[in-house]
């Protein structure tokens, strides 16, 4: 009992994440499984100009990270960047944001654990999906419960697998172009990109639709904004991690996409097959499909690991700021002897674990798919709120003149918000996303009104 009180009073997490951990996690945060599996689909939408879509979207995500980075630099003790919404926009919007963000990340975790089972069944099709999900969730849950430095180490190696796979793709592309490698599609050459180039080869609407697909490939880029309070020397580490985001986007996304389109003319690419598998098979790697399956499996495991970390910290924050009977009963506002929010992590993991059983219930699984799609739109609302909070921060007494400042914030901040609104609007233009967009709009309005009412003066 005394030990428990001690940990509750201490309320400080261990700074166990090093510069090495954070820098590599920042890279991993910009690279999702979509690059490995969905690049063919995104390229088929708008051809070589997809690189421009990635650069534009990545640029705005970088600006958002500069806003988050500026506020975290001023106050690196915060467990989450969501706290700045509470501080500068009020308890109502803070309540809306922290609950919405926590639930959205939980649904991302559910989607990732479902994907993990699918990737494992590539090798072991007879293994039951629910068992695979429970095993992975248990293992990664334990990783999060032991110590934050163990979490950081596991994330480091998960990220390295993705990085090596992309470097291998870029190196393969350079080799094939320089040697004029012959494939069933012709010679590998940069001409495959420039030949009959058109900015909108499939029409302007497909170019616009590409933005939403690319935007969601960048989800969780803000993850390093949750690790600051557990990072050693955050005022040195955080600016470096944020500053290098544009270079990572250009190199990893731009390099990989250009390599793919140099080897295979973009009109010949399959929208459903992984171009990574296709390219590696062209150079004689017979087990390319198994290799890329391993890469996306570790990528999904990395995302699940990060969601357990993030949901645990956010539920811990909720338990501190807006405790209810349930959160008090499970003592979600306490830290373990390893200085991690053990009970909050376990509660989040249990909720994510429901995915293992939801997916076998047809009616429920359809509703789950709609809710998951809706959470994507809610993410955009939170991104907009953090940009508004940044504007308020700049006018507050907390503003740190010699801090890590967002450049030209007076016009770049509103421009970033307009971009997020544009992406949200595109969700209503496509049949596959319109139901999720409506669901997210209903949540934003209904829960937003409730949150403001709950904390009305």
Question: For each predicted feature, which ranges?
Answer:
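Extracellular loop-to-transmembrane helix junctions
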Residues: 14, 37-136, 245-250, 254, ...
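Helix-loop-helix junctions that connect adjacent transmembrane segments
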Residues: 8-13, 51, 125-128, 160-293, ...
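C-terminal membrane-solvent junction of multi-pass transporters and transport-like membrane proteins
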Residues: 158, 330-340, 380-431
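Membrane-interface loop-to-helix entry segments
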Residues: 117, 130-188, 215-219, 242-247, ...
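Membrane-interface "cap" regions at the ends of multi-pass membrane proteins
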Residues: 1-40, 44-49, 61-66, 77-78, ...
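Membrane-helix boundary/coupling elements in multi-pass transport proteins
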Residues: 77, 100-114, 218, 222-231, ...
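TM-loop-TM module centered on a large, flexible mid-protein loop between adjacent transmembrane helices
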Residues: 83-86, 90, 122, 241-305, ...
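Helix-loop-helix connectors at the membrane interface of multi-pass transporters/channels
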Residues: 1-6, 83-86, 112-133, 165, ...
């Amino acid at each position: 009992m005394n030990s428990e009180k001690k940990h509750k009073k201490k309320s400080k997490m261990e700074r166990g994440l090093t510069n090495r951990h954070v820098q590599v996690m920042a890279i991993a945060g910009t690279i999702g499984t979509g690059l490995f599996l969905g690049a063919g689909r995104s390229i088929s939408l708008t051809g070589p100009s997809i690189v421009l879509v990635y650069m534009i979207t990545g640029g705005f995500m970088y600006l958002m990270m500069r806003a988050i980075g500026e506020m975290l630099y001023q106050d690196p003790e915060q467990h989450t960047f969501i706290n700045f919404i509470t501080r500068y926009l009020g308890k109502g919007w803070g309540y809306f944001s922290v609950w919405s963000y926590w639930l959205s990340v939980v649904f991302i975790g559910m989607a990732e654990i479902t994907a993990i089972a699918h990737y494992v069944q590539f090798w072991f099709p007879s293994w039951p999906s629910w068992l695979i999900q429970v095993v992975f969730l248990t293992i990664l849950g334990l990783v999060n419960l032991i110590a934050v430095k163990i979490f950081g180490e596991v994330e480091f190696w998960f990220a390295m697998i993705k990085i090596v796979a992309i470097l291998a793709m870029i190196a393969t592309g350079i080799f094939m172009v320089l040697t004029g490698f012959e494939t069933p599609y012709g010679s590998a050459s940069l001409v495959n990109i420039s030949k009959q180039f058109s900015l909108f080869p499939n029409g302007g609407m497909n170019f616009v639709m590409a933005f939403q697909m690319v935007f969601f490939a960048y989800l969780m880029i803000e993850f390093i904004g949750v690790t600051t309070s557990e990072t050693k020397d955050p005022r040195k580490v955080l600016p470096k991690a944020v500053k290098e985001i544009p270079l990572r986007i250009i190199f990893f996304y731009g390099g990989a996409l250009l390599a793919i389109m140099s080897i295979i003319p973009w009109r010949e690419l399959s929208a459903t097959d992984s171009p990574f598998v296709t390219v590696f098979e062209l150079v004689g790697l017979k087990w390319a499909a198994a290799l890329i399956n391993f890469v996306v499996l570790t990528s999904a495991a990395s995302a699940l690991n990060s969601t357990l970390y993030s949901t645990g910290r956010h539920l811990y924050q909720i338990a501190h700021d807006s405790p209810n009977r349930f959160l008090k009963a499970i003592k979600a506002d306490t830290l373990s002897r390893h200085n991690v929010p053990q009970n909050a992590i376990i509660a989040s993991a249990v909720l994510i674990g429901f995915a293992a059983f939801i997916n076998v219930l047809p009616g429920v699984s359809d509703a789950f798919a709609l809710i998951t799609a809706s959470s994507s739109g809610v993410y955009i609302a939170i991104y907009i709120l953090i940009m508004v909070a940044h504007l308020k921060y700049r006018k507050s007494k907390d503003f740190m003149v010699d801090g890590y400042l967002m450049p030209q914030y007076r016009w770049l901040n509103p421009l970033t918000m307009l971009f997020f609104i544009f992406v949200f609007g595109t969700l209503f233009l496509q049949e596959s996303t319109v139901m999720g967009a409506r669901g997210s709009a209903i949540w934003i309005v209904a829960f937003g009104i409730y949150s403001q009412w709950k904390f009305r003066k």
